[in-house]
Amino acid sequence: MTQFASPVLHSLLDTDAYKLHMQQAVFHHYYDVQVAAEFRCRDDDLLGIYADAIREQVDAMQHLRLQEDEFQWLSGLPFFKPDYLNWLREFRYNPAQVCVTNDNGKLNIRLTGPWREVIMWEVPLLAVISELVHHYRSPNAGVDQALDALESKLVDFTALTANLDMSRFHLMDFGTRRRFSREVQQAIVKRLQQESWFVGTSNYDLARRLALTPMGTQAHEWFQAHQQISPDLATSQRAALAAWLNEYPDQLGIALTDCITMDAFLRDFGIEFASRYQGLRHDSGDPVAWGEKAIAHYEKLGIDPLTKTLVFSDNLDLPKAVELYRHFASRVQLSFGIGTRLTCDIPQVKPLNIVIKLVECNGKPVAKLSDSPGKTICHDKAFVRALRKAFDLPQVRKAS
C-alpha cells in the first residue's frame, strides 16, 4: 500500500474541545495519574492493513505544537488558566506512547502514559484513521459529494420543520473523530454556519478559524478514571462530578450521564449537583426515555427543567433531532450534537464505527457500562461485577 502523501493533521487544536477541558482538569488535579487506552472497531472492519500508514501519521504528530495565534486565542476564553496554557504551549505528542499493530488483519492500538498526555491522542488519532481509510477506500469521494448530500438533507429538513417554531433548536457539529476528512468537516461546518440554528462545533481548530463557539465539557474517561482515583468505588461518580465543579465551578457544566447507566447517575445527581450543573448529555440508550427521566428528576428536586439544558449526541441525524425537538422543546432547553451523519455522510461511503476508550487507570481496570449494552467496555469481568454491585446494577451484561 502506498503511504499517505502528507500529514493529515495540521494543528494541535484539531481535536474536540472537551479534550482540552479535561486535560486542564487533569493537569491541575491528577498530574501524575497513569492510564492505558485501547482502540476498538465496533464493526467487523479489518483495518490492520492500514497499520503502517497510521504509524507514519502518529510519528508525524510529534511535530505539532501550539502556535502563537492559537495560544492567544485560547487565552481569550474564560475557562483556561495561564499555568495550563503555558504548559500546553510546550506540549508535544510522544509517539512512544502509541503501539500500533496489525494482528491478522485486526487493527490493534494501545496508548499508555501520563493521563495529562495520553488524553490528547484519542480524537485526532481516530480522525487520522478515518481519513486514511476513506482515502484508500473512496478515492473519488470528497467535499463536493459531501456538500451535495448535505444540501439534499437540508431541503428535507426545511420541509420537515416548516410548521415548527425553530427558535429554540440548536445544532452543534460533533463530527471530528469519524469525519471523512479534515476538508469535508470544514466544508460542512462552513455551510451550516449559514443556518440560524447552527450554534458551534466541538472542534477547537475550526472554532478558532471560523469564529464559532467551541462546544464540549467532559467525556466518559473523566468518570472512568475516578473509579480508581476515588478510594471508594461506590462514590467514584460523585467524586468525578465534584472534581469537575472544583475546576469549572460555573461554566462547562453539562454532565455526561451514561458511564454507569442513567439510573445510577441520577442516584448520584442530588440537589447540589443538579443545581450547579447547567444540564445533562445523552450518549446511549433510548433518548426519549432518557429525557423523560432527566425532566422527572429535575422536577422531583424542585428544579424547573426550563432552566436546564439536555444535550443529545448519540447517533443523531437531522430527522432524529427534529423528532426529539418536537417531543421536548416546550419543557426543557435543548441542544443537538451530530457527528458522523454530518461529516461522513456521503453516498457509497461506509463510516467507521471506531472508538478509543480508557481501560486502565494507575494500572487497575476501569469500565464503561452505558445504557447501550454493546457499548460496554472492560477487559476485567471481576471489576465489571464489582462496579455493578457498587452501583446496585443487575449482573446481566457481559463486558466486551
Swiss-Prot record:
<dbReference type="GO" id="GO:0034355">
    <property type="term" value="P:NAD biosynthetic process via the salvage pathway"/>
</dbReference>
<dbReference type="InterPro" id="IPR040727">
    <property type="entry name" value="NAPRTase_N"/>
</dbReference>
<dbReference type="GO" id="GO:0004516">
    <property type="term" value="F:nicotinate phosphoribosyltransferase activity"/>
</dbReference>
<keyword id="KW-0662">Pyridine nucleotide biosynthesis</keyword>
<dbReference type="InterPro" id="IPR007229">
    <property type="entry name" value="Nic_PRibTrfase-Fam"/>
</dbReference>
<dbReference type="InterPro" id="IPR036068">
    <property type="entry name" value="Nicotinate_pribotase-like_C"/>
</dbReference>
<dbReference type="Pfam" id="PF04095">
    <property type="entry name" value="NAPRTase"/>
</dbReference>
<protein>
    <recommendedName>
        <fullName>Nicotinate phosphoribosyltransferase</fullName>
        <ecNumber>6.3.4.21</ecNumber>
    </recommendedName>
</protein>
<dbReference type="Pfam" id="PF17767">
    <property type="entry name" value="NAPRTase_N"/>
</dbReference>
<dbReference type="InterPro" id="IPR006406">
    <property type="entry name" value="Nic_PRibTrfase"/>
</dbReference>
<keyword id="KW-0597">Phosphoprotein</keyword>
<dbReference type="GO" id="GO:0005829">
    <property type="term" value="C:cytosol"/>
</dbReference>
<comment type="similarity">
    <text>Belongs to the NAPRTase family.</text>
</comment>
<comment type="pathway">
    <text>Cofactor biosynthesis; NAD(+) biosynthesis; nicotinate D-ribonucleotide from nicotinate: step 1/1.</text>
</comment>
<comment type="function">
    <text>Catalyzes the synthesis of beta-nicotinate D-ribonucleotide from nicotinate and 5-phospho-D-ribose 1-phosphate at the expense of ATP.</text>
</comment>
<dbReference type="InterPro" id="IPR041525">
    <property type="entry name" value="N/Namide_PRibTrfase"/>
</dbReference>
<feature type="modified residue" description="Phosphohistidine; by autocatalysis">
    <location>
        <position position="220"/>
    </location>
</feature>
<keyword id="KW-0436">Ligase</keyword>
